[in-house]
């Protein structure tokens, strides 16, 4: 592709490059540079890509996009923001695949993954759609499963994936859109047919620093969608909508008055939730096989999205009744022959842990037992908060390790326990997560619900940059054999 075509719609501050030069590839990692490629130098959180311009040149790069003229003897294009430039370049390189797809973006602290799976399920069953999915657990092209490394891929990988999806015949794409992705322009250049806001609670403050900045990051999505679907029960929706530029807003909720889609007569069961959904003159009874109060919100935003795309509520409800849940989201781990229940859930944030515990308290016949830890090298302020939530809502707490990463596991546990000091809730601290799970099973009583919180779909534990195999389903199954 000609350099001039790659740079279309990109404001250029300065260049000495031949705009008619043929470019063979695009990269932003100098180690991937090759003969005739365009290297985009990005100033990242840990390193500055401008340092690697000489290496890219040595590897054959024909031109570099950067934020200041390089010292190395190489044709260059200077732009104001090379990260945003990468997004524009990616759109051009892959010929704007998002324009060929009905794009649906879901943002919020919790509920993104479940919502995307529910939307995919409804559209495939009731709209005759082939749906691409991009998210935390995995990426999917229809039923084909692809590996994923982060909630929202970098802009170049994202556009490449969207091109794959379009070429494979996908009509719709539903994707989780993280606050990082919005701030770091990973989704820049994409227009969403529907943008969804699930909720906002403490998370990623190591990146955003304040809740207001975190909310404003989420709000970017509502500048880039045709319909903005939002949770009217979440108090942050007011700030989120202050400057929203989307032409149509659509609200959902359980408690808020005047919502466009409302859940009534909510019933919580051990293996499901049920409620009546109302929008305009339409009504439908809904049952979903994910046992939690917050499932109602995830279901409402999925129904709101699909209703705005032309699927009647009754059709949404019929599709949802056939859905059997999402891996690592209130997932029941089989315990044949035992009179206790083990749930696996990805709740690694304060509000998610609180929601899970409140939901389980609503149907547990025995004790509510929670086993959890907090991730290392992440927001430390939420650790005592989560400890306090666990102590307040659970009958017994087992504090253990999540992904310690480069931190000392005991230090993380001590941070969590700081939030439990003034409570009389019994607890035990066991740094080894496998031992902790065995302890929970050994001490289970009849009717107990044991929540293994934090890992969810993950089948590994990260310690000192190494991913060690750890699948809680396998741990439970193996222990039951002995």
Regions found by a protein language model. Name each.
Residues 23, 36, 61, 73-74, ...:
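Short, well-ordered alpha-helix to beta-strand connector turns
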Residues 62-68, 228-232, 371-372, 395-403:
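Short internal beta-strands
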